[in-house]
Amino acid sequence: MIEEAPRIIAHSRFLIAFTGAGVSAESGIPTFRDRGGLWENYRIEEVATPEAFRKDPNLVWSFYKMRMKIMKGAKPNNAHLALAELEKMGILKAVITQNIDNLHREAGNQHIVELHGNIYRVKCTRCDYMENLLESGKLEDFLKEKNLPKCPECASLLRPDVVWFGEPLPQEALQKAFKLAERADVCLVVGTSAQVFPAAYVPYIVKDNGGSVIEINTKESGITPIADVFIRGKAGEVMQSLLVKVKRCLENKKC
């Protein structure tokens, strides 16, 4: 069954990837679960919610600046690079990710839907101001600044442009993801437990429309029962192996 995966990918008409924290684990980015849900003895709910930000924005910004530094030092791993290569080959049409680390973009993917935001983007709590600090070249100065970040247009407090616990997903990104899923005939699920809805509907939409679902995970998940192919393993190792086999499959017309 596992050997079917390269053929399914190679012959796909509209392949999408749905990725989660497992993709970035090999880049050294810790997840909340890795640390037992704690940061500096604070529960994650105390630093990653709207209530926490209203109560103590300094604490929340300390947490997110720490995460920015960690993610800034991380590099795309073999899973990111394989997905970027599949897009370059014209096979992968889009990456729908729950990650905020920007690594898909750094690896070279162009068509990305970020369901949970981007760690390097800030937005105003009052007006429509938004800025990607990495792209604008202001990240280093931002990380050194001791004072709370203020909006350059209205002087209100800036916040990370990420989805906090208890917040809905951005509708524009979610609708874009669903539309891509409706067009897809194959969904490659990589490194996600797919427990958070409505984002986790993505592979179900593909399956309901008669498409195939290929899951790559270190353990079975909520997606496994609907997966046509389940491959157990680390995302980087499996994706690199798959990429080689897909290329071989395309070269061999009988595949």
UniProtKB/Swiss-Prot annotation:
Highest taxon listed in the record's lineage: Archaea
Lineage: Archaea, Methanobacteriati, Methanobacteriota, Thermococci, Thermococcales
EC number annotated for this UniProt entry: 2.3.1.286
Membrane-spanning segments: none
EC main group: transferase
Organism, scientific name: Thermococcus sibiricus (strain DSM 12597 / MM 739)
Physiological role: NAD-dependent lysine deacetylase and desuccinylase that specifically removes acetyl and succinyl groups on target proteins. Modulates the activities of several proteins which are inactive in their acylated form. Deacetylates the N-terminal lysine residue of Alba, the major archaeal chromatin protein and that, in turn, increases Alba's DNA binding affinity, thereby repressing transcription.
SUPFAM superfamilies in alphabetical order: DHS-like NAD/FAD-binding domain
Binding site for substrate: Y64, R67
PANTHER family membership: NAD-DEPENDENT PROTEIN DEACYLASE SIRTUIN-5, MITOCHONDRIAL-RELATED
Example of a GO cellular component annotation carried by this entry: cytoplasm
Entries under PROSITE patterns matching the protein: SIRTUIN
Family listed: Belongs to the sirtuin family. Class III subfamily.
Catalytic activity as recorded in UniProt: N(6)-acetyl-L-lysyl-[protein] + NAD(+) + H2O = 2''-O-acetyl-ADP-D-ribose + nicotinamide + L-lysyl-[protein]; N(6)-succinyl-L-lysyl-[protein] + NAD(+) + H2O = 2''-O-succinyl-ADP-D-ribose + nicotinamide + L-lysyl-[protein]
Entry note: cofactor: Binds 1 zinc ion per subunit.
Signal peptide per UniProt: none
Entry comment, domain topic: 2 residues (Tyr-64 and Arg-67) present in a large hydrophobic pocket are probably involved in substrate specificity. They are important for desuccinylation activity, but dispensable for deacetylation activity.
Active site (catalytic residues): H116 (proton acceptor)
Subcellular location: Cytoplasm
Residues annotated to bind Zn(2+): C124, C127, C151, C154
Start and end residues of each Deacetylase sirtuin-type domain: 1-253
Key word Kinase present: no
Protein residues bound to NAD(+): 20-39, 98-101, 191-193, 217-219, 235
Cofactor requirements of the protein: Zn(2+)
GO MF term list: histone deacetylase activity, NAD-dependent; NAD+ binding; protein-malonyllysine demalonylase activity; protein-succinyllysine desuccinylase activity; zinc ion binding
Protein name (database record): NAD-dependent protein deacylase
Record carries keyword Glycoprotein: no
